[in-house]
Design a protein with these regions (language model features):
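Single conserved hydrophobic/aromatic residue that forms the stacking wall/gate
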Residues: 1-11
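Alpha-helix N-cap/N′ positions at the starts of helices
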Residues: 2, 28-32, 226
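Single, functionally critical "micro-switch" positions that shape active/binding sites
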Residues: 11, 80, 97, 160, ...
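Extended interfacial segments that mediate partner engagement and assembly in macromolecular machines
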Residues: 13-83, 88-89
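Acidic, glycine-enriched active-site microenvironments
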Residues: 25-36, 106, 255-257, 263-264
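RNase H-like nuclease fold core
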Residues: 59-145
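Acidic/histidine-rich catalytic cores and adjacent linkers
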Residues: 64, 89, 101-102, 109, ...
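Short, surface-exposed amphipathic charged segments that create phosphate/polyanion-binding patches used
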Residues: 94-95, 167-178
Length: 320
């Protein structure tokens, strides 16, 4: 772009030609700046955009530097989760979303209770009282924040996370038991682990026969499989009231069984029972938030990480 200058003869002065598409003292058009910013909505790197535009990486970073996202208002439902960002001196960062409208609200520099408290203290009491649902995983600081700052909200433990506790317990028993078998049997058990994890009533007749053969080889695994299957039946409950007694009974049975993995699982379920039962009252989950985390991982992997948290935050919010 040629910077044409005009000369005013009467006062012997020179001045730049005025262009609507070129800000004063700039050599880059507004359209090019807007194009660069729009390209960065995808999980691409500054380097790839700079190469495409034939610009330096620092120029692309400087152009994106004008993008700055402020804080949004709190919705009626909040979803919160952590992800491994390794930026700004912290290993984990925190993402806050609206799981109903599918909107990313903010990214916090850490998942600590101190960081979360500092953030939510910025909102008025009336705004916090309007939050009706608070969805999270089994990270204790999240529950503490919900209790302290969102007294009118219903705390919900995401279904995926508490169901996973039982699957982890069963998988641990399977791995422990298969170590006792011969090499041939170990290989067979390892290849068939998805059959053991899948609900028994969803298997074909042939698959059921395979599972029964494996369970016959290990009484401990057979007991663990029974507890796992009994637990999965609770998922068929339609509401909190119908799930309350079966869940309490299962926790009691698992707590008093002779399998350490399920005893530990029962203790975890007992500690989070209110949030687990509340998950039967609504279809709201952390599914959207987990999906955002996957996209953030792609951005981080492509860029080989971010050292500057503010820049990382703006890139994430810009993508959504």
């Amino acid at each position: 772009l040629c910077d044409r200058r005009q000369r005013q003869m009467c006062i012997r002065d020179r001045f730049a030609e005025k262009n609507k598409f070129l800000p004063r003292y700039h050599r880059m058009t507004n359209r090019l700046s807007a194009y660069i910013i729009d390209k960065l909505r995808d999980a691409v790197t500054y380097t790839s955009v700079a190469r495409e535009m034939n610009l330096s990486v620092n120029t692309v970073i400087r152009v994106f530097g004008v993008v700055d996202y402020g804080h949004k208002n709190l919705p009626s439902a909040l979803s919160i989760d952590e992800f491994k960002g390794n930026t700004g001196g912290e290993k984990y960062q925190c993402i806050i979303t609206d799981p109903v409208k599918k909107v990313v609200l903010d990214i916090l520099p850490a998942r600590t209770e101190v960081c979360l408290t500092k953030y939510f203290a910025k909102f008025s009491k009336s705004e916090r009282e309007n939050v009706k649902y608070f969805v999270s995983d089994m990270w204790k600081p999240f529950a503490n924040i919900a209790t302290a700052w969102f007294k009118n909200s219903k705390q919900i433990v995401d279904k995926y996370h508490w169901i996973r506790q039982v699957n982890w317990a069963f998988e641990s028993v399977r791995k422990e038991e298969q170590k006792k078998f011969s090499k041939t049997h170990r290989r067979y058990f390892k290849k068939s682990r998805f059959l053991l994890l899948k609900r028994f009533d969803k298997l074909t007749d042939e698959q059921k026969q395979q599972v029964n053969i494996m369970l016959y080889a290990s009484p401990t695994l057979s007991t663990a499989h029974f507890y796992k299957e009994d637990f999965l039946k609770i998922l068929d409950c339609k509401d909190r009231e119908t799930a309350k007694k079966p869940m309490a009974d299962w926790i009691n049975w698992a707590y008093n069984c002779d399998i350490p993995q399920f005893v530990k699982c029962a203790k975890t379920m007992m500690n989070w029972l209110t949030g687990i039962l509340n998950s039967f009252t609504t279809t709201i989950t952390n599914g959207f938030t987990e999906g955002c985390n996957n996209k953030i991982k792609v951005l981080k992997r492509n860029a080989y990480g971010f050292r500057n948290f503010k820049r990382f935050r703006n890139r994430i919010l810009h993508m959504f």
